[in-house]
Amino acid sequence: MQRSPIEKANAFSKLFFRWPRPILKKGYRQKLELSDIYQIPSSDSADELSEMLEREWDRELATSKKNPKLVNALRRCFFWRFLFYGILLYFVEFTKAVQPLCLGRIIASYNAKNTYEREIAYYLALGLCLLFVVRTLFLHPAVFGLQHLGMQMRIALFSLIYKKILKMSSRVLDKIDTGQLVSLLSNNLNKFDEGVAVAHFVWIAPVQVVLLMGLIWNELTEFVFCGLGFLIMLALFQAWLGKKMMQYRDKRAGKINERLAITSEIIDNIQSVKVYCWEDAMEKIIDDIRQVELKLTRKVAYCRYFSSSAFFFSGFFVVFLSVVPYAFIHTIKLRRIFTTISYNIVLRMTVTRQFPSAIQTWYDSLGAIRKIQDFLHKDEHKTVEYNLTTKEVEMVNVTASWDEGIGELFEKVKQNDSERKMANGDDGLFFSNFSLHVTPVLKNISFKLEKGELLAIAGSTGSGKSSLLMMIMGELEPSDGKIKHSGRISYSPQVPWIMPGTIKDNIIFGLSYDEYRYTSVVNACQLEEDITVFPNKDKTVLGDGGITLSGGQRARISLARALYKDADLYLLDSPFSHLDVTTEKDIFESCLCKLMVNKTRILVTSKLEHLKKADKILLLHEGHCYFYGTFSELQGEKPDFSSQLLGSVHFDSFSAERRNSILTETFRRCSVSSGDGAGLGSYSETRKASFKQPPPEFNEKRKSSLIVNPITSNKKFSLVQTAMSYPQTNGMEDATSEPGERHFSLIPENELGEPTKPRSNIFKSELPFQAHRRQSVLALMTHSSTSPNKIHARRSAVRKMSMLSQTNFASSEIDIYSRRLSEDGSFEISEEINEEDLKECFADEEEIQNVTTTWSTYLRYVTTNRNLVFVLILCLVIFLAEVAASLAGLWIISGLAINTGSQTNDTSTDLSHLSVFSKFITNGSHYYIFYIYVGLADSFLALGVIRGLPLVHTLVTVSKDLHKQMLHSVLQGPMTAFNKMKAGRILNRFIKDTAIIDDMLPLTVFDFVQLILIVVGAICVVSVLQPYTLLAAIPVAVIFIMLRAYFLRTSQQLKQLESEARSPIFSHLITSLRGLWTVRAFGRQSYFETLFHKALNLHTANWFLYLSTLRWFQMRIDIVFVLFFIAVTFIAIATHDVGEGQVGIILTLAMNITSTLQWAVNSSIDVDGLMRSVSRVFKYIDIPPEGSETKNRHNANNPSDVLVIENKHLTKEWPSGGQMMVNNLTAKYTSDGRAVLQDLSFSVNAGQRVGLLGRTGAGKSTLLSALLRLLSTEGEIQIDGISWNSVSLQKWRKAFGVIPQKVFVFSGTFRKNLDPYEQWSDEEIWKVTEEVGLKSMIEQFPDKLNFVLVDGGYILSNGHKQLMCLARSILSKAKILLLDEPTAHLDPVTFQIIRKTLKHTFSNCTVILSEHRVEALLECQQFLVIEGCSVKQFDALQKLLTEASLFKQVFGHLDRAKLFTAHRRNSSKRKTRPKISALQEEAEEDLQETRL
């Protein structure tokens, strides 16, 4: 970045804002890059501002211990500059009050009786012009100074809040909503930037009103209060409209949240929607919600319209109510009329615009300051003082709870009752989730480790393993007992955490760089081969959360970070959960057994191999110590427990989830059988029920129910019900997880992440955007590693983890920790912003847009709804009628040959009124001219309403049409298009852009149309009265158009860069929250504060430059029109044949043009910016419909296919058999991407069951997606002799029943989720739910089938969701069933239900199954082996077993033997089909065989 020119600019350059000229010139000529932005001035540095405010806040805390106020700290930092700019701003407003005095004297000089004053008219005109010049010179520096000050206040508060977050206790974080925290930083603090500029009007407006009332009293005496009274009533009317508008907006917010919740679920599960052919059903559901939302949107728009239009139409009434009563009683002169009109223009702006805006600004700002103040008062993480000489780690009878104790409860009650002030966030959350029982997550835990020992911690699900590590780190405060260790800790979290930055930055983590240690750690964690693949090696910049890495790569980088730090104690929370067996074993040996052999290690694990090699074992069950000792002691003291685990074949080769399930069940059985369960059981009974869980009887029934998930049965909800933000991995490494509720320990005990394939793959899990369910910060820390709005990396871009053998560290005598590195280190963070790194970290896929909105966008927007064209024509006709009436009035006046002038108001609607009114003031004609004036005013006022209200109404209708078209295009778009787009970016069109088009655009367009017509109409009238003014008007119009075009090219680019620069701030905030425990464990708070300040400085550089260029433009527009006013003034005065009425009209209109034009210019810029949202929406509307690409490709290759629309021989019963033939199938995720499947050919007989085999990433799931035509495909597939080229997409997909790994459950009733098209009766649905075992569960909910599920059906277990998917397949009556690892997340019971249902209900269907469980493949007759993107083998089981094929690599010896035995049994005579009613008994029998 270049140094900012403002630092070396002189006073003249700063006054006239000449210093931003280089960036404006560059932006006009070429596209601006981040490197083109200037560095921030030193006074705007986040470090300096935060230090200043933090110092004053600490001073406030010290001096005002009882009631410290943040506003006092802000006052001490910024008050004097704020006051200086306020005085400057009042001086500007004072000049506006003086201008009518000069105008009155100029008009008086044209009176025939005042010929002596005619000579001084030129001096008066010069004085009037100088007032405008002075106003322009002082206004813009004052406004810019206040905006700059508001920006500095926001930066300081941003930094203060971030520092507080890093200090906040984990208990408090569990009660803070993540969305509210982000809102605190964005919505509330953004009020300072623009709000400070108008804050001074809270005192300027009353002073101005008093001054103006005194000046108008001098003209109209006591009648001045008539106009003022009307303005006050108008302000009260606007306040009432504002209150009504807020009521409507509150009601609408619920509908918006409902619409966005379903929209986000649909977008994140778009492949499921397409597979089930639910596009039309989902569109109807959203449209129904949208209709209700739009009714409230119209009411909000009407309120805003009447509030805005009240300003435009109030001018006439104010003048009429003030002047008319005075005219009937006293003699009135034209000078008084025009002077009064000018005063009232200023008074109207002050009362109806400036003062209400200032009040609203102070209300919002003080509310934001109170929220921030309450946040800063929350409890902080307590830093414990440790004895650094301590060698051992000891814990004695420690008990701890994440809940609050009774004493704390009463303390809060007392404090709340005594203060009775603004509700504190903690209080509200605490009482809304109050529990009478304190539930210890750990109870009476004791152990002792000497230096160099390894402690392995294992336990049942939710037993408190991770909470134990949190307690050692000081994140969880013990309520009893003592903990002893040195405090030098390193930590590897359960969910791998990656910060934005390079790979090297993530491993070193701000410590000094030691090449030998770094190389040793990289090799030990098997990262060397991964790093060499990246183009920039370890300097490769990783995105937020490491979204470009696979789960295993993230896990190994997280482990390497922990190893690189030289600590006394290493806490490793399930660090190997994302790795395969071979890699895990190698890393365990190289890291824990060799590299860290002299260090004290605590490892959370569920593997027997780790327990055997550990020096000590700690087994936890429901927070209690089940066993502590060595492995040999475990075999002696707990023979039942150890024998059951050792008797489980290949226990360590199971997935982590299944191992946890087995451990949990084993603990339960052994605890009960050994009598240990008494204590544990009583403790277990104290656990709290979920806020949203079903009634107690539901849990009792479920215990004996067939559908019991042992993994989720022991889970606990936290004090505050939170939304889940699930872990996610990218790439080809196996990783699975249980996205369940919060566990008893508040730490997720699921030890595997969830695999993520490209979006087109329905079978691979993708997580729904949690639209409105509350997510606490603690949940974010414990459940998520990447943002839900994630980049879906293509599978080809991610490489499988390294499997190379590593260096034998046993042969090395050098200890990598022998040379201790500095904690703060020499790893310095450059103060200069590395914009390229930041840009890469937060890379966006936003397509390049035009610098400014094109005319084609405006034209398309206008023609979206033809009524808008008619309304715009109506507006133009009314405008021409108003101008024509004004000109007719002028003609009538000249025809009467009365030598008087005319007057005007500030709107084009009132121009003719002023003409007639001014003619009327003569010595004898009072009453009839008043009647004419009033009649004309009423009629033109009505025409103004006719013009504005239909415009706003029609613009809202256009918004409805755009949303409907965009939704339809997105739902009907091809999956190949979704593979290139972020889910979050699509959702932004429905959130941000739709809100802009609904709310902001209609009223902004109305303001712009109204203002531009006022200016144009005034110029027309002035030009008719004085044709010479055209000599000034035409050049001014040209200059204005050129200036606007010149400025917009740069400003829109700066606005875009500013928007992009805002992303790293919030991304860093979320990243810090996710890794807060890691940051604290490593003591890197100051390092992260510096990174946050760099992100703040980057945004400041963009925002400050935007404000500066905006002020450059606005000042030049003012200068141009001041020159225009000067020209018009002296032309009017220099003309000898004009009367005082014409001079009054010309000068009053010219003054009105100058004051109105700035507003009109700002509106035009706003409209151009808002239309960019319309442009983005159009790009999504233009997404080609699904099937168009395939159709075009086939048409190009084979013209005969053009005539094939639908096969005439297709019957309603198709497909009847389910026979499928695949010929030369090639599939790509994008039309221009590489082939992920190449020339696959095979055939499946009707009713046959085929198993898909292959390594992870071989293409099994891709094949299932290709069969459903979700990808860009070539080749041919036939079902029962019918080719897919002759069948519509919906018809083709309805031939398949699909059971994916992750089920799509949208917000809606059970019935809607099972049958969204409402094709089946309740009886048929109940029959199917009973068949799959869901009936008893659904009946336990209040409304049964009409019970509404929200947030992806979070209240249901994964088993229930899979059974719902099974029920959908039964209802679809499909003849071909596709299954992709449907049992990956299931407990044994639900697995048996699905297995039995497939065996009986789908006995006559063709089944294609991709599965890793041997038990699931027992029924398959044929196996398709995929390797290298093509079919390796397609044979029966016997041939695969006899040949040296890939099959032998996929399954072990015991698994192959089990398959062979099952196949022989299946090849014999089939058993008679049992009754479905026997399903439960059979499942219970098989459960005993498969549970262990």
UniProtKB/Swiss-Prot annotation:
Residues 1-78, 148-196, 245-299, 360-867, 954-1004, 1049-1109, 1166-1492 are cytoplasmic. The gene is CFTR. It is an enzyme of class 5 (isomerase). Belongs to the ABC transporter superfamily. ABCC family. CFTR transporter (TC 3.A.1.202) subfamily. Residues 655-840 are annotated as: Disordered R region. Residues 100-123, 218-223, 321-340, 889-932, 1026-1027, 1131-1144 are extracellular. The keyword Nucleotide-binding applies. Residues 1465-1492 are annotated as: Disordered. Monomer; does not require oligomerization for channel activity. May form oligomers in the membrane. It catalyses: ATP + H2O + closed Cl(-) channel = ADP + phosphate + open Cl(-) channel; chloride(in) = chloride(out); hydrogencarbonate(in) = hydrogencarbonate(out); ATP + H2O = ADP + phosphate + H(+). The chain crosses the membrane at residues 79-99, 124-147, 197-217, 224-244, 300-320, 341-359, 868-888, 933-953, 1005-1025, 1028-1048, 1110-1130, 1145-1165. ATP 2 binds at Y1229, G1254, R1255, T1256, G1257, A1258, G1259, K1260, S1261. One of its GO terms (molecular function) is ATP binding. This is Cystic fibrosis transmembrane conductance regulator. It is a multi-pass membrane protein. Binds and hydrolyzes ATP via the two cytoplasmic ABC transporter nucleotide-binding domains. The two ATP-binding domains interact with each other, forming a head-to-tail dimer. Normal ATPase activity requires interaction between the two domains. The first ABC transporter nucleotide-binding domain has no ATPase activity by itself. The disordered R region mediates channel activation when it is phosphorylated, but not in the absence of phosphorylation. ATP 1 binds at W402, S435, G459, S460, T461, G462, S463, G464, K465, S466, Q494. Expressed in the rectal gland (at protein level). InterPro entries: AAA+_ATPase, ABC1_TM_dom, ABC1_TM_sf, ABC_transporter-like_ATP-bd, ABC_transporter-like_CS, ABC_transporter_C-like, CFTR/ABCC7, CFTR_reg_dom.
